[in-house]
C-alpha cells in the first residue's frame, strides 16, 4: 500500500510538471491555412458597426458581413490590421490589439484563416508615412527593437487569449522604404530595416513557430522596387517567409498591371525562393464589371504560379460604403447596403 501511494504521488507530481511545461510552451502551429487564400481585409468592420452600419447580401437580406463574404463569395481568409496606440477615430485608428483580436476570433469562428498586419504605428503605415508610435519617439534603436519585440508578442498573446493563432503576420505594412522612420528607413539604413524585420519575425515565431511572416510592399508590378527592397533585406540577413504585394490598377490598365505583377512574382520566387501573396488589391467602386474581371484574372494567375508558390489574393476593405473616410471608392458595396458584382471574381 505504501509503495502504491508513493507511485501515485510520483505520478501526480509528474503530471503537474508536464502541465506546467505545456503552459509555458509557445503555440507551435498556426491554424490550417487554405490551399489558396481568397481573402478580404475587413479591418474597418468594427468601426463601421460602431457607427450603425449593416450589410445586405445580393438579395437584400441583412446578414453578418463575414458570413456574406464566406457564403456568397467563397472568401476563406481575412486580413486585420493592428495599430499600437490608436485614436478613437473609427476610420483612421480604433483597431488596437484587443479589438483586432475580437475581430479575429469572430472570423475564426466563421471558419476563416487569419492574416495580421502590424503597422507599428498609431495610425496608417504606407509608402508615404511610416511614423513611429508616439510612445516610441524618443527611443534609441535598441529600445525600438525591444518595443517591436514586445508589441509583436503582445499582439500574438492577445490573439492566443481569444483562441486564434494567425496563419500569417505582416511585419509592417507597405514598407517600400522601410519602417519606423527614420531609424528603419531603408534609404537611411537597410541594415536597421533588416534588424527590425528580424525582430518582428522572431517575436512572432517565439509564440507560434508555424505562423508565416510576410514583408509587404506596394506597387506589385514594380520589379525594380522589389529587387532593391527584398534583395537589400536578404543581403542584410533579414529572415521572413513570404513576399507580399499590393496592386491598385485602374479600369483601363488592370490587365497589363496584373501581367507585370505576375512577372514580378515569378522573378521574386526565382531570385529568393520565397512564395508570394497578394496582400491588397482594389479597383474603382463604380467599375464593378472591370473589378470582377480584375479579381478573377489576378486570382487565377496567382493560383497558377508554378509549384504552388502563389499563396492567395486579398481584396482591401470591400465592405466600405462609397466615399468612406473622406473618399475611399474601391469598396464593393453600394450605398443601399447591397454588394456590387466585384467580388464575384473570387468564385471558383
Q: PLM ranges: what are they?
A:
Residues 2-15:
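Bacterial N-terminal signal peptides that target proteins for export
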Residues 19-29:
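C-terminal segment of classical bacterial N-terminal signal peptides
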Residues 33-113, 119-148, 154, 170:
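N-terminal substrate-binding region of glycoside hydrolase catalytic domains
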Residues 34, 64-74, 102-113, 157-164, ...:
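Acidic (Asp/Glu)-rich catalytic clusters
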Residues 40, 117, 169, 243, ...:
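Conserved, mostly hydrophobic/aromatic
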Residues 43-45, 83-85, 119-123, 171-176, ...:
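Active-site beta-loop-alpha junctions enriched in small/polar residues
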Residues 50, 54, 267-273, 284-348:
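Aromatic-rich peripheral "rim/lid" segments of glycoside hydrolase catalytic domains that contact
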Residues 90-101, 125-231, 236-240, 251-263, ...:
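Active-site cleft segment of glycoside hydrolase catalytic domains centered on the general acid/base Glu
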Amino acid at each position: 500500500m505504501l509503495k502504491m501511494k508513493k507511485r501515485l504521488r510520483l505520478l501526480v507530481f509528474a503530471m503537474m510538471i508536464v502541465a506546467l511545461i505545456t503552459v509555458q510552451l509557445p503555440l507551435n502551429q498556426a491554424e490550417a491555412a487554405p490551399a489558396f487564400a481568397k481573402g478580404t481585409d475587413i479591418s474597418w468592420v468594427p468601426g463601421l458597426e460602431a457607427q450603425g452600419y449593416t450589410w445586405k447580401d445580393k438579395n437584400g437580406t441583412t446578414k453578418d458581413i463575414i458570413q456574406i463574404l464566406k457564403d456568397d463569395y467563397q472568401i476563406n481568409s481575412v486580413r486585420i490590421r493592428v495599430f499600437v496606440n490608436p485614436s478613437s477615430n473609427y476610420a483612421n485608428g480604433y483597431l488596437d490589439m484587443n479589438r483586432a483580436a475580437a475581430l479575429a476570433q469572430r472570423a475564426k469562428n466563421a471558419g476563416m484563416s487569419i492574416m495580421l498586419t502590424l503597422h507599428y504605428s498609431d495610425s496608417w503605415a504606407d509608402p508615404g508615412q511610416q511614423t513611429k508610435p508616439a510612445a516610441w519617439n524618443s527611443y534609441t534603436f535598441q529600445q525600438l527593437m525591444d518595443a517591436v519585440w514586445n508589441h509583436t508578442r503582445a499582439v500574438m498573446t492577445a490573439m492566443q487569449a481569444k483562441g486564434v493563432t494567425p496563419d500569417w503576420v505582416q511585419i509592417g505594412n507597405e514598407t517600400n522604404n522601410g519602417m519606423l522612420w527614420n531609424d528603419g528607413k531603408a534609404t537611411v539604413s537597410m541594415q536597421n530595416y533588416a534588424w527590425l524585420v528580424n525582430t518582428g519575425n522572431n517575436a512572432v515565431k517565439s509564440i507560434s513557430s508555424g505562423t508565416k511572416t510576410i514583408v509587404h510592399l506596394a506597387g506589385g508590378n514594380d520589379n525594380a522596387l522589389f529587387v532593391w527592397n527584398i534583395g537589400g533585406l536578404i543581403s542584410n540577413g533579414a529572415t521572413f517567409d513570404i513576399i507580399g504585394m499590393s496592386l491598385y490598377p485602374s479600369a483601363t490598365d488592370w490587365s497589363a498591371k496584373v501581367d507585370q505583377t505576375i512577372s514580378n512574382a515569378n522573378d521574386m520566387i526565382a531570385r529568393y525562393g520565397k512564395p508570394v501573396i497578394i496582400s491588397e488589391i482594389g479597383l474603382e467602386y463604380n467599375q464593378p464589371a472591370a473589378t470582377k474581371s480584375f479579381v478573377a484574372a489576378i486570382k487565377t494567375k496567382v493560383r497558377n504560379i508554378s509549384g504552388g508558390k502563389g499563396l492567395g489574393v486579398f481584396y482591401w476593405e470591400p465592405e466600405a460604403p462609397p466615399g468612406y473616410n473622406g473618399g475611399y471608392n474601391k469598396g464593393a458595396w453600394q450605398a443601399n447596403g447591397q454588394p456590387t458584382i466585384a467580388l464575384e471574381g473570387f468564385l471558383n
